A protein has these predicted regions:
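Beta-strand/loop-rich accessory regions of lumenal/periplasmic or secreted enzymes
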Residues: 114-123, 138, 153-363
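Intrinsically disordered, low-complexity Pro/Gly/Ser/Thr-rich segments with frequent PxxP/GP/PP motifs
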Residues: 81, 87-124, 132, 140
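Exposed beta-strand and adjacent loop surfaces of beta-rich binding modules
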Residues: 63, 79-83, 127, 186, ...
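Extended substrate-binding grooves/exosites of carbohydrate-active enzymes
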Residues: 1-65, 73-78, 83-93
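Edge beta-strands of extracellular beta-sandwich domains
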Residues: 139-152
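Short, hydrophobic/aromatic beta-strand segments
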Residues: 75-82, 96, 304-313
């Protein structure tokens, strides 16, 4: 219910928020499909996907052949039309409409779409989106409402090898980044249009300016990260305690080296992680335009009995004016690795605020 906490801030309360003596299911009755402000939770879209009554499966996608199954018991699909899109790395390259769907109840029909993949780069991921829409309005649903959809993979994504090369204009020499090691606190890498500072006491990248633009928030550092906020299920399994050693493990800098290799600046930092029985290695490769490739590698002592970790990555804070995100992945709704059927692969552009969903209690 709508509630105010002890500081007078509006919150959505659940069992246990009101007193300590009444029987309660805690947040168990507050994790449904619709939030108290009547906004669908992201998992509502997952449920909607599985509630649909028209299912599309591949027959021979290389030939554009798909199977359409009508799960309805008492109506055919004549009230709907199908829109399809062919996507290459998230970009729509072909579209079409099938207006006559002759599929009886509980029957499957094969349909051939005029898909042509011959002139599409073989390195790109190919996806087929299909959507079934109403030809005419029905009760509360206007004409054109999508009542079922599917996304089929024609060609899987192949991640390119992550290479960092210098950018060379025609007939102009490459200006190799210089490394300044005459400051007591900072190792500085300078290029034609960029400057980067590494903290000599912990080895972390702590300043990154390109073309006069500050890429990192003042006081921020690019640091290793092995933690995320535990979810409700994590708490139920006690993972916040089992994995606690990874929340802020000690990272003792044992080596900070630098060199110019292949006309690029390279900074290497090594760390001892006694609390988890491991060693961490960070390598920063910087080209002539200030682009950075960061590699993080960990060596674990197999004789040490250490818990698993929530995640393995890096984090930093960016200036507030970096408030838009463009990505190729699942969206536009928030989704998990095991709850993403309702989120299609595509190219999406969102604000940072739109990337966040305020779960009352993340499950």
């Amino acid at each position: 219910c709508h509630w105010k906490n002890k500081d007078g801030v509006d919150i959505y309360g659940y069992g246990g928020d009101f007193n300590k003596y009444d029987g309660s299911d805690n947040n168990f009755n507050d994790n449904g499909l619709i939030s108290p402000d009547r906004v669908p939770n992201p998992h509502a879209y997952e449920v909607a996907y599985f509630y649909q009554d028209i299912w599309t499966t591949p027959a021979d996608l290389a030939k554009g052949e798909i199977n359409i199954f009508n799960e309805y018991f008492f109506r055919d699909l004549s009230a709907y039309y199908m829109e399809w899109q062919l996507l290459a790395n998230g970009e729509v390259v072909q579209t079409g409409i099938v207006s006559d769907l002759k599929v009886a109840p509980q029957q499957t029909v094969k349909v051939q779409l005029p898909i042509d993949t011959k002139n599409i780069c073989p390195c790109k991921e190919l996806l087929l989106n299909v959507s079934y829409k109403l030809k005419a309005a029905e009760t509360l649903l206007p004409a054109g409402t999508a009542i079922a959809y599917e996304q089929l993979s024609i060609r899987d994504y192949k991640a390119p090898e992550l290479k960092l090369e210098n950018v060379q204009a025609s007939n102009l020499p490459v200006i190799v980044p210089s490394i300044l090691d005459n400051d007591q606190n900072y190792l500085i890498v300078k290029g034609e249009n960029f400057s980067m500072d590494f903290n000599k006491h912990n080895g972390y990248l702590c300043r990154y300016d390109v073309n006069g633009m500050q890429m990192m928030e003042d006081g921020s550092e690019l640091t290793p990260n092995f933690w995320r906020a535990p979810t409700d299920n994590d708490f139920g399994a006690g993972l916040q305690r089992k994995y606690a050693v990874w929340k802020n493990p000690e990272l003792k800098l044992t080596s900070l080296r630098h060199a110019v290799e292949n006309d690029q600046a390279v900074v290497r930092a090594e760390y001892d992680m006694k609390s988890v029985g491991g060693k961490l290695f960070l390598t920063y490769t910087i080209n002539n335009k200030g682009a950075v490739k960061v590699t993080q590698r960990m060596e674990a002592d197999k004789s040490k009995k250490v818990s698993e970790m929530f995640r393995f990555g890096m984090q930093m804070r960016m200036p507030v004016n970096f408030n838009e995100v463009e990505y190729y992945g699942r969206g536009p709704v928030e989704n998990y690795s095991d709850r993403n059927h309702g989120a299609k692969l595509g190219k999406y552009r969102q604000t940072v605020e739109e990337q966040f969903y305020p779960y009352i209690r993340p499950q």
